[in-house]
Amino acid sequence: ARTSIRFRRGHMGKTISQDPTFITPKNYDTNNTVIKITNRAPKLKTLNLPINIKNVLFLTDIHIPYQDDLALNKAITYGLEKNVDCIWLNGDIMDMYGASDHEKLPDHAMIHEEFDAMHDFLGQLRKLFPKAQIYYKEGNHERRWTRLLMRKAQELIGMKEFELNIILKLEEFKIHWVANETHVKF
């Protein structure tokens, strides 16, 4: 339906598709609409990356502590060779298996072990790229932490000590946290 409406309004392609009677039918009173939605979704926050960034190493879906070490080391080596000045961690950097809704297997890492592995990774990343700006965009696996709190301990939501960026000590590693709802302009 949306595509058809966009076509009729002339908002698609280069063909002449505008139908003036469709856009504004005769005797149409804009004040007497059938549906009027006043509450809209909030606008996303926008993050504009600094214009001085030249080379970005883009890492995504690492799923620590279940990472592919060979692939991760190749990507890091590539970033070192290219002398990147920015690293973009695009979500699902940690797996958060322990916080998932899935039935837990006994041989998988516990949440505290996943946090330890993340601290280790972020510390090594900062040492390897001491001058790079690092951004960590929240992914759906990181959101598992919030969902776990919502299911098991709603009272803790909003307390700084239980926010994922605080637990991961991102400030200590000089890593910028980018919330899931943020629109990013490169």
Where are these regions (language model features)?
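Acidic, histidine-bearing metal-coordination/catalytic regions of metal-dependent phosphoesterases
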Residues: 1-58
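Extended hydrophobic/Leu-rich segments
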Residues: 7, 22, 125, 153, ...
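Short, solvent-exposed polar/charged micro-motifs at secondary-structure junctions
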Residues: 13-16, 146-147, 185-186
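Short gly/ser/thr-rich secondary-structure transition/capping motifs
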Residues: 39-41, 69-70, 175
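A broad, low-specificity signal for short, low-complexity segments enriched in glycine/proline
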Residues: 46-51, 96, 154-155, 180-181
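Conserved beta-strand segments of alpha/beta enzyme cores
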Residues: 55, 133, 174-176
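Core catalytic region of metal-dependent phosphoesterases/phosphodiesterases
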Residues: 59, 64-171
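Short acidic low-complexity segments
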Residues: 167-185
